[in-house]
């Protein structure tokens, strides 16, 4: 299979140029002007369009069982939506397994979920839900098998205490793995939530009030210090929602500590006023949506380089699930938002087209840095000879309004309903194969490959 993309503006994190791009057998073979292939190939005219590396979304939750519900996107519908949104690689955060289970148990479960279903290439983050000698001994073996990042939780059912966190940080660091963490102060949240429930205050607004930004920021500061105590272990903060936490991360960076951070479109573009609407239960996620001032602080981090990655935390529960389970009580509502199909378009429209970020910075946030941090570079996140032929073509001249009826996930709503975006995704190619074309999904279930990731090597801070 040969594909020649002509006349587009090819963009990598380190520059852009109007040039052609030739893909053969799923691999980028040549970039240059006026490429004339020796053999017949499919030609795509990308005149007036940007040609970007396919998106790498390092934070999804497909087919996750949270105890009270299972998310409604599996590895087919979830990766189909990703493909239609210009994302060609996902790294899914595995959910909790049975009490006391080994790390390998969850890996085998999740490989079963994805096999024969995933449309695009995929990998997983391990999850450490308890600490004992067997788990610690298992970590190096998992890294050898291609899982080079693991998630810790400071809240929810399988939260770790500080001693357990230190043990995990040390062993992960020694084993060549990156520690990722969901940082919220569980005790403070439980106290606030109990107060509201006792007072009968269970509307969606109280979800946000029960998880104030200080709960998140305190946990970020604590993890930064614990990582330092654990021998300067590398640390990756997921789904940052506030400026105070970002300030702590800036300080750690100034002290040459290896820390990185992601945020998500919902924290850049949605705010806490959504909880006061008739459909407020649609927006229950943790950490919750913040105010516009926090959005502005995050945009500063996007613009000046303090934020490294934009991912989605895609975790879809339908409105029907939310209403049936919660019965109007925020504390009983499953948490999470859909968004894997909208990430690239939303950031391009609100970032590149507004002048907040350059096209190169867009690549850094959506594909290059995710690939570098999580052991996929230069196979992913780069358009250069030898890299995978993963491409998204965006036409900046087109304007689109997001409507859920045109999306490809398995939810029954979109938090982005009615958003108007400048710039449209017109083609997605995965290893040279067209999987999305002018509004139509053209991929197939099971073509995605499991990616064995390299051990963690820190990018230059």
Curated annotation (Swiss-Prot):
Family annotation (InterPro entries): Amidohydro-rel, D_phenylhydantoinase, Hydantoinase/dihydroPyrase, Metal-dep_hydrolase_composite, Metal_Hydrolase, Metallo-dep_Hydrolases_sf
Gene3D superfamilies attached to this UniProt entry: Metal-dependent hydrolases, Urease, subunit C, domain 1
Enzyme Commission code(s) on record: 3.5.2.-
Mod. after translation: Carboxylation allows a single lysine to coordinate two divalent metal cations.
Sequence positions bearing N6-carboxylysine: 151
Taxonomy, superkingdom: Bacteria
A GO CC term attached to the entry: cytosol
Binding residue positions for a divalent metal cation 2: 151, 182, 239
Keywords: Hydrolase, Metal-binding
Summary of the function given for this chain in its UniProt record: Catalyzes the stereospecific hydrolysis of the cyclic amide bond of D-hydantoin derivatives with an aromatic side chains at the 5'-position. Has no activity on dihydropyrimidines. The physiological function is unknown.
Subunit-structure text: Homotetramer.
Alphabetical list of HAMAP family matching this protein: D_hydantoinase
Name the record gives this protein: D-phenylhydantoinase
Naturally occurring in which organism (per UniProt): Escherichia coli O127:H6 (strain E2348/69 / EPEC)
